[in-house]
Amino acid sequence: MKIKEKIVLAYSGGLDTSVIVKWLQNELNFEVITFTADLGQGEEILLAKKKAKLLNIKNIFVKNLKKEFIKNFVFPFLRSSSTYENNYLLGTAIARPLIVKELMKISYYLNTNYVSHGATGKGNDQIRFELGFKYFNPKIKIIAPWRIWNLNSRNSLLNFCIKNNIKFDSKTKKYSIDKNLFHNSYEGGNLDNINYEPDEPMWEHTLSNYNSLDYPIYISLTFKNGDPIKINNKNYNVEELFLKLNNLGSIAGIGRLDIIENRLIGIKSRGCYESPGASIIMYARKKLESLILDKEIYSFKEEIALKYSKLVYNGYWWSPERILLQKIIDYTQTSINGIIKLKIFKGQINIASINSINSLFNSKNSSFDEISNLFNQSDSSGFINIKSLRLII
């Protein structure tokens, strides 16, 4: 009897990856090993483990990666001040490299030649997964079911479940949802109609401005080397800190986004996102940067943030250029130390106060009402004459 090949599947516990398990077993005769990364999905993790057992999986791997996710992926990303196309905080894209890293550890440990994922042939995740797989093992063989099988609709997936005795939730989900500590994302379903306004129940993580608190919340954040370390002068570990800011931002209506984005393969898609904690951190740290960083460093960092965001979105987290940019970014953050007090209210974030020992702001130098010894104002005439040369010639 031929020994079955082993394959490690990135398993979420959802309909798609549950069908993939049985399809890999029945159609390709694989021994399937599942890996589920706990990045803050809550009860979905326990459900995924339970479903894997029902699918007769012998080797089920589940790992709590929440702290590593925030410390080694989210915080380095937030230091970059990057947003994709000036909007999206990349909560899905930033999670995929960690999932891949841990999955490939299992593949190496069990000496498997194959790995698999549940990303479709239209989206970005197929690229993010597979670039990572090849980075860790250039010889690995990848099975991407959505690019192979003929199960091309939800109905065909449900019929496959019935035929193969796979238990599933018969209640149709309106959207494709991805969750982690960083964000919630919603795609597909009614959102494919760009004139459809999302219904309020869709937003699981934040309150609307109408339903959010009727009074402002004041938050004091302490930063060290570009990362938040305290809330209201109280220390938290990275996971606790992010959860706390998520909760505070949620009840204040912070971090909702409804956008049209350009996928890597060229298709435009609509996505709705909730990132309350990340939005607060990004705002606060950028305000500290404006206070502390030299003008040219600040400008240069904004330029490389554009490149950085594209690399992360397009699946190049492990690329040498992303790693190089990270070193430059982290160097700029050594002086980003201070305390900023924020007022969050009805979806808005504003500064209440800001202080840093590394501040370059001097009220005497910038004030119209005080005389500064830093330079003679009459020197500006020569400066302007030089600057105007290219407009005169």
Curated annotation (Swiss-Prot):
EC nos: 6.3.4.5
Q: How does it assemble?
A: Homotetramer.
Sorted keywords for this record are: Amino-acid biosynthesis, Arginine biosynthesis, ATP-binding, Cytoplasm, Ligase, Nucleotide-binding
For this entry, the protein name equals: Argininosuccinate synthase
- Annotated GO biological process: argininosuccinate metabolic process; L-arginine biosynthetic process; urea cycle
User: Which amino acid positions bind ATP, per UniProt?
Assistant: A10, Y11, S12, G13, G14, L15, D16, T17, S18, A37, G118
Residues engaged in binding L-aspartate: T120, N124, D125
Q: What is its main location?
A: cytoplasm
**In the UniProt record, what gene is named as encoding this protein?**
argG
Q: Which GO terms describe its cellular component?
A: cytoplasm
Q: Matching HAMAP family, A to Z?
A: Arg_succ_synth_type1
Extract the CDD domains matched here: ASS (cd01999)
Q: Which reaction(s) does its UniProt entry say it catalyses?
A: L-citrulline + L-aspartate + ATP = 2-(N(omega)-L-arginino)succinate + AMP + diphosphate + H(+)
Quote the pathway field: Amino-acid biosynthesis; L-arginine biosynthesis; L-arginine from L-ornithine and carbamoyl phosphate: step 2/3
**One Gene Ontology term of the molecular function aspect:** ATP binding
Which InterPro entries does the record match to this protein?
Answer: Arginosuc_syn_C (IPR048268), Arginosuc_syn_N (IPR048267), Arginosuc_synth (IPR001518), Arginosuc_synth_CS (IPR018223), Arginosuc_synth_type_1_subfam (IPR023434), AS_cat/multimer_dom_body (IPR024074), Rossmann-like_a/b/a_fold (IPR014729)
Q: Which residues bind L-citrulline?
A: Y88, N124, R128, S176, S185, E261, Y273
